[in-house]
From Swiss-Prot:
GO terms for cellular component: endoplasmic reticulum membrane; nuclear membrane; perinuclear region of cytoplasm. It is a peripheral membrane protein. It is found in: Cytoplasm, Perinuclear region; Endoplasmic reticulum membrane; Nucleus membrane. Belongs to the NPL4 family. This is Nuclear protein localization protein 4.
Length: 568
């Protein structure tokens, strides 16, 4: 149905459903006409001059409950907002709430302050003194193509890309207002188009339908490197496959930090792996998504108290060669695939679920820093890790439900247009047999390589500034490993911790409690109050752990834990 809104700027039509909340309809009207509205002043009425009902009072009622029908006129009055909200639409539902503050990651705040210039020394072409500078030795911008080609860097970093766009979009010589250089692509058809026609699938126009899409390999990457704090972390993860022959899936917990090996680079530092409930098989696995999501929300909250974020996912794809020497088949290479179409879609859904906050984007978010790691066989038949992200175009295609998996893992199938989804023309650029770049129609399927962004990976180095957060990765069973005959219970807790908790060796006790899975289990017992829990976390992961640990052993919570172990 269409509602007509009469205001001081004229008549405007807004498409809606009878079940839509009236507050949402008014908010869509604000967005469509691009108004600068003070939400506290918006009032509506049925007749000219009768607009006295504040929208905030009726925002929670549906259009049907308001008695509005197709074609009805709503008279609306408002005052223009001013100040810091200029040029931005404000949600009318959130009366009294200030404009949203975008909370960026600390690493983004840090890198935004740096220029990232690539310094160069004097060369033989320089004709000046030590204090001079010329075109042969002046610093290069962080996105310089020749520098990246010489150093074999396939992608520029996100912040290099951002500075490149910002320099082109907001030139210093221009006196115009600031324009956000980033915009999250949206390939979905606009079902609220107010261009005088019924919504899709009963009507369509050039304004509401998405434009043709041309896929290109992404030149930047949100994360440049994945750093795993301990090699034993991966060994513990693949121990499940070694014991059962079944594949395994887990989430990576860690943080994002500055990466010095590329200009303005970012790395995901992995401190722990958590395996959600799953049914493993030789060629895949099955999960109850609702159960997994419920459990992971709890783990996320506990991990946050340790200063950790869910930074990615990891899964295995291993098949033993049968030679008895620990070798595995190499399944993923340039002549087969690196990530299958189904895995691309899975990665895109996770990236959409973990958006990257950015104040330089029109939407306040841009792509994601969530990474995908695969443990599989390399060309030497050794167990190895590869790390990826999918492009921002992949995120938009999956969000718009335009692609699905195919029987060929290296190809993504393009869905047909239906009542819910409008699929425009999709093309991709390729080099033909004559070495020329040509545009190909992507339907019915196209190579998933156009959606893939490869990352580097490695383990912590001796000179790394990062402190190892958890000193123990094994000893205490990981969660959800009942298929291996392992479970987290009081007996396992006693076997792992009791002697250290009562022996008086604080170094040993620190090493034992510095275990991600032990801490999660202790939290689930609900023995520790908030104060003692904070003390336990400090004792487990802090550099200066001695005094907090001594204090911890005197608390009622810790002594209750020891008492429980004694009773087993």
């Amino acid at each position: 149905m269409l509602l007509r809104f009469r205001s001081k700027i004229g008549m405007n039509r807004v498409s809606c459903e009878a079940t839509d909340l009236f507050g949402d309809v008014v908010e869509n009207w604000v967005k469509e006409v691009g108004l600068n509205v003070d939400p506290g002043t918006v009032v509506v009425g049925n007749d000219p001059g009768s607009a006295k009902e504040p929208v905030s009072n009726i925002a929670g009622r549906s259009v049907e409950e308001m008695g509005l029908k197709h074609g009805d006129i709503v008279y609306i009055e408002y005052s223009d907002s001013s100040g810091s909200n200029e040029g931005q639409s404000v949600p009318v539902n959130a009366v009294g709430a200030g404009s949203a503050v975008i909370s960026e990651l600390p690493v983004d705040v840090l890198l935004e302050k740096e220029d990232g210039l690539i310094k160069r020394t004097r060369s033989s072409l320089c004709k000046h003194g030590d204090k001079g500078m010329c075109e042969y030795c002046s610093p290069l911008p962080p996105w310089d193509k020749e520098y990246h080609a010489e150093n074999k860097l396939k992608h520029i970093s996100f912040h290099s890309y951002l500075k490149k766009l910002n320099e082109a979009t907001n030139k210093k010589s221009s006196g115009s207002s600031y324009i956000p250089p980033l915009s999250q692509p949206d390939y979905k058809i606009n079902k609220r188009c107010n261009n005088g026609h019924e919504p899709w699938p009963r009507g369509i126009c050039s304004k509401c339908q998405p434009s043709a899409i041309t896929l290109q390999q992404q030149e930047f990457r949100m994360v440049d490197h994945v750093e795993i704090q301990q090699s034993d972390l991966i060994n513990q993860f693949i121990e499940s496959w070694r014991a059962t022959g079944m594949q395994r899936f887990g989430y990576l917990y860690g943080s994002y930090e500055k990466y010095d090996s590329t200009p303005l680079g970012v790395k995901a530092v992995v401190h722990a792996i958590y395996e959600p409930p799953q049914h493993d098989e030789q060629d895949g696995l099955t999960m109850d998504l609702e159960q997994v999501e419920e459990e992971m929300q709890k783990v996320d909250q506990i991990a946050m108290s340790m200063g950790l974020l869910r930074v990615g996912l990891i899964f295995s794809d291993l098949t033993d060669t049968g030679n008895g020497n620990g070798t595995v088949f190499c399944k993923r290479h340039k002549d087969s695939f690196f990530l299958s179409s189904l895995e691309i879609i899975m990665a895109a859904k996770h990236q959409l679920a973990f958006p990257n906050a950015s104040r330089f984007s029109e939407q306040g978010k841009f792509s994601s820093k969530f990474v995908t790691c695969v443990v599989s066989g390399n060309l030497d038949s050794e167990i190895d890790i590869t790390s990826y992200q999918v492009s921002i175009e992949a995120e938009a295609l999956v969000d718009a439900k335009m692609i699905s998996g195919s029987t060929h893992p290296s190809m993504a199938y393009i869905n047909e247009t239906n009542e819910e989804v409008y699929v425009p023309e999709i093309f991709y650029m390729k080099t033909n047999e004559y070495g020329l770049t040509v545009k190909e129609n992507a339907k019915p399927a196209f190579p998933v390589d156009y959606l893939l962004v490869s990352l580097t990976h490695g383990f912590i180095t001796e000179d790394s500034k990062n402190q190892i957060k958890f000193h123990s990765t094994g000893g205490f069973p990981w969660a959800n490993r009942q298929a291996m005959g392992l479970s987290q219970d009081y007996q396992e807790l006693k076997n792992y911790l009791y002697s250290a908790a009562t022996g008086g060796d604080y170094n040993l006790l620190h090493e034992k409690i510095s275990n991600f899975h032990l801490l999660l289990y202790i939290k689930s017992l609900e023995i520790f109050n908030e104060k003692d829990w904070s003390l336990l976390i400090t004792s487990a992961i802090s550099e200066n752990w001695e005094q907090p640990l001594i204090q911890l052993t005197t608390t009622e919570s810790f002594n209750s834990l020891v008492l429980i172990m004694e009773m087993i």
